[in-house]
Amino acid sequence: KAYEEFFCKLQDGAMHELGMSGGEMFAYHATNGSNLDMEDECFDVDGLALSLDQNIYPEYDIILCISDWSATAPLTVKCKDFGFRGATMHGLNDIILNSGLSVDYNQVSSDAEKLRLAMTGADEIEIDFTLDNDRTLTAKLFLDGQEAQKSHGLCKGKTPEIANLPAGEVYFVPVDAVGQFPMKYHD
């Protein structure tokens, strides 16, 4: 999907229309987990082995990482080391293309900021999940009054930064939790 929707369209004239250069596609080794360190070795579309640190990061102002696993954390470190801006997007399909990527991110950022300000300083939050059988499960997350963070999807200006797409989330790192959560994830 990334090849069709991004690489081919960029190569078929979108780069020229935008007044940009680049638009190449590279593959890197799967990390098999979100936000894990990425191996330095990568490959171009002809299969030539390259180095992310030597051949990719220093050569581009903007990097879009479309992958199976989130690369936001490792690329945030690399963007500060090498001075690029970019976005990560794990999981790409028609639903995301036609919804989460088809919105005005200035409005998304504004809405997320309102929620972030309202939730900053909260000691705890409680979330109720109603299941298909009308049973309600409650999870309580303890936040210790921390400042809420937001994923706004924007990287304006020249400051090295990585956005996570699609965006609009407001999030915390809970210090503890109690209750029931209806989904289970592997470690």
What does each of the following model-derived ranges do?
Residues 1-180:
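Active-site bordering "gate/hinge" segments
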Residues 183-187:
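Internal helical hairpin/lid segments
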